[in-house]
């Protein structure tokens, strides 16, 4: 029974530590808006939340949320969200998202995912279906399984064979001065 009591003590000590870490996370978050807690909240498949969901860390969402979801870490979705999502990174696989997605870093929309809303990020890989505009200040990769109904603004775009896009693609964030390249009259006068 000594081993069982050791396990209990370790679990109990872990809980105390977790509470201390949570208090520390709240303090750090108040002092630094960029702080990301080293924890992941899990919303299980059978759980449904009506209302906004906020986390200082990451969220793994297998259930459903009717409300806005905000987390400072990575938001991984295999369930459904009806509302906007803001995260450091956003990953969705076999998910349903009805609302805008905003990420400071990468957005990955996996095959089997349907998004009805705009996407804003630093980079994006799209393998699912998106009905909305995609605004990415870095690279965008459109996989062969992707279906997009909306405009894409990015620094660069890679469209794999088989992808379906109904919209415009613009590399408006690229480091290319289009006017100087196509200024034929100005080049002749020099």
Regions found by a protein language model. Give the residues of each.
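Intrinsic disorder/low-complexity segments enriched in polar/small residues
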Residues: 4, 24-25, 188-189
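C-terminal segments of enzyme domains that contribute to small-molecule binding surfaces
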Residues: 166-190
């Amino acid at each position: 029974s000594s081993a069982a009591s050791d396990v209990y003590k370790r679990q109990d000590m872990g809980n105390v530590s977790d509470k201390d870490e949570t208090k520390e996370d709240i303090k750090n978050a108040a002092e630094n808006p960029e702080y990301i807690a080293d924890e992941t909240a899990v919303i299980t498949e059978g759980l449904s939340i009506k209302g906004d969901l906020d986390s200082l860390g990451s969220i793994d969402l297998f259930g459903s949320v009717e409300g806005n979801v905000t987390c400072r870490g990575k938001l991984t979705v295999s369930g459904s969200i009806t509302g906007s999502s803001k995260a450091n990174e956003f990953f969705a696989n076999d998910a349903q998202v009805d609302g805008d997605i905003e990420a400071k870093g990468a957005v990955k929309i996996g095959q089997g995912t349907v998004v009805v809303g705009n996407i804003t990020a630093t980079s994006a890989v799209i393998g699912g279906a998106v009905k909305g505009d995609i605004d990415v200040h870095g690279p965008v990769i459109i996989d062969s399984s992707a279906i997009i109904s909306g405009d894409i603004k990015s620094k660069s775009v890679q469209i794999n064979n088989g992808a379906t896009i109904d919209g415009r693609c613009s590399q408006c964030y690229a480091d290319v001065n289009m006017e100087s390249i196509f200024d034929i009259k100005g080049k002749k006068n020099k």
